[in-house]
C-alpha cells in the first residue's frame, strides 16, 4: 500500500525544473535569470549559450531539464514552450576565514543560490 499521489501544483500546460546549491550569489544569478524570463525556450537557450557569465552554464542545464520534463513527463510541444517564470532563492552561506595582517582574520562569505524555471506551452499563432 502506497501513499496517495499528490495533486500537481502546476497547470497541465506547464513544467518546471529546480537547480539547488548553485555556488553563486543570488544577485548574480538573478542577472542571468532576467535574461531568459518571458523568452521562447529556443531563444533563451541561444542567449545562455553565448552569455559570458560563468553561471549561465548551470542555468542552461536547468532550462534544458525543464524542457525535457515538459516533453517527456507532460507531453508538451517543445517548439511552443516559453519561459514563464525564472526565479532565484537564497541558499546557505558558507563562512570561511582568511588570515589578515597583525594576526587577525577576516570572514569570507561563500553564498549559494537556488534557481526555479517554469516553462509554459503557448498556442502557436496561425500565420496568415
Swiss-Prot record:
One of its GO terms (biological process) is translation. GO terms for molecular function: rRNA binding; structural constituent of ribosome. One of its GO terms (cellular component) is cytosolic large ribosomal subunit. Keywords: Ribonucleoprotein, Ribosomal protein, RNA-binding, rRNA-binding. The keyword Ribonucleoprotein applies. NCBIfam families: rplV_bact. This is Large ribosomal subunit protein uL22. It comes from Rhodopseudomonas palustris (strain BisA53). The lineage of its organism: Bacteria, Pseudomonadati, Pseudomonadota, Alphaproteobacteria, Hyphomicrobiales. The gene is rplV.
